[in-house]
Amino acid sequence: MRKAKPNAAERIESYLVKLIQERGADKDQPFAVRMLLAFLKFASCLFAAGVAFRYFLYKTGLKRRYPLGIQVISIGNVTAGGTGKTPVTEIFARKLAAEGRKVAILSRGYRRKEAPWWVRLFTQVVTKPLVVSDGKHVLLDSATGGDEPYMLASNLPGVAVVVDRDRVKAGRYAIKRLGCDTLILDDGFQYQKLKHSIEVVLVDATNPFGNGQMLPRGVLREPVRHLKRADIIFITKCRGDVSAVRDEVRKYNKTAEIVECNHTPKALRDVWSREEYPLSWLEGKTTCTLSGIASPKGFENSLRHLGAKVVWCERYADHHRYDSSEILYALNRTADMGADALVTTEKDAVRFPRFETTPVKCLYLRIAIEILSGQESFDQIISRICFRRNREG
């Protein structure tokens, strides 16, 4: 079976991502690429102006921030993709639920199946938010609810997950209909419409701020100086000395608590049966990988650190929605190469169509956050949320 070709939008996206990640001088590029980079730079200036104007509207009160009367913990970043928000969201939700809080995670549900924009335009006011989980049962699949919301709902029994573009509406629904007393705003740093009690910001130690430029010429969603709004900063993917990253962060925020953490493999499971294998199973095994995430190299290197020999890597654009032919192609390619297993990420696994039989094992690697330093600071933040009177910060 031949490999299905990525669509034009994915090819363009992949090319642009590769282009903006390159750190060489623009003058060293071919003329056509220099023209494209100049256009992206111009677009970045427009984007930066739009971001500044938007924050001006909120700061002056011309646009309103809505308090909901309970604790709202925003978890986000200043860059586009790849910092590891989902595991950090999970650790916050799990800890708060264990302390007796009734938690709801609010998400936009990025790249989920939605009605056309003209339908949403006329139905947004009357349409109810989507409840991926009510805290007791997972009610929607990943296509309808979104990859991250479905994954969080599956991993967090007792925690509600609510999806809507309007997170204020989603929050009100979680409070009124689900009885929640604590809200976690997933990817919330840029979402200023809902007033935040605590601002948690993630910084990727392996690539803190990209090339330092705003989208689309760089990866910044807003200026790095906006780190000053953070109450707690998680430096993620810490391997080795990250003092330089810590010092850089301190230039923009002198007072925030800093937590250093790593994304650590915790389990290896069959994609469909959920049968669990010890991580030691990978040692000495020949594997192939399939992923559609923002930072695939980190995932592939994790397998190598666990002792696997990775012989083939198939990468798709972030949040790629797989069809059966793509999965079957990867499985057959893995079998043809004599590899022991096709390994994917947990986020990708929720997007796989189901197969009753496969020519080779298909496993996913479950990742969790391991706090390396700053555990006391994290615990203090949790206590601050749990024992502060229910008021908006």
Task: Give the location of each predicted region.
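A transmembrane-helix-recognition feature enriched in membrane-embedded lipid enzymes
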Residues: 8-71, 385, 389
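Residue-level signal for inorganic ion chemistry
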Residues: 46, 86, 152, 186, ...
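Glycine-rich phosphate-binding P-loop
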Residues: 73-92
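N-terminal phosphate/diphosphate-binding loop that engages ATP/GTP or pyrophosphate donors
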Residues: 91-159
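Phosphate-binding/switch loop-helix module in NTP-utilizing enzymes
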Residues: 151-195
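Conserved catalytic-core segment of NTP-binding enzymes
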Residues: 173-176, 188-281, 288, 300-301, ...
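Redox- and metal-dependent alpha/beta enzyme cores, enriched for Fe-S-associated oxidoreductases
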Residues: 266-269, 273-275, 280-324, 379, ...
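Generic C-terminus detector
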Residues: 335, 339-341, 347-393
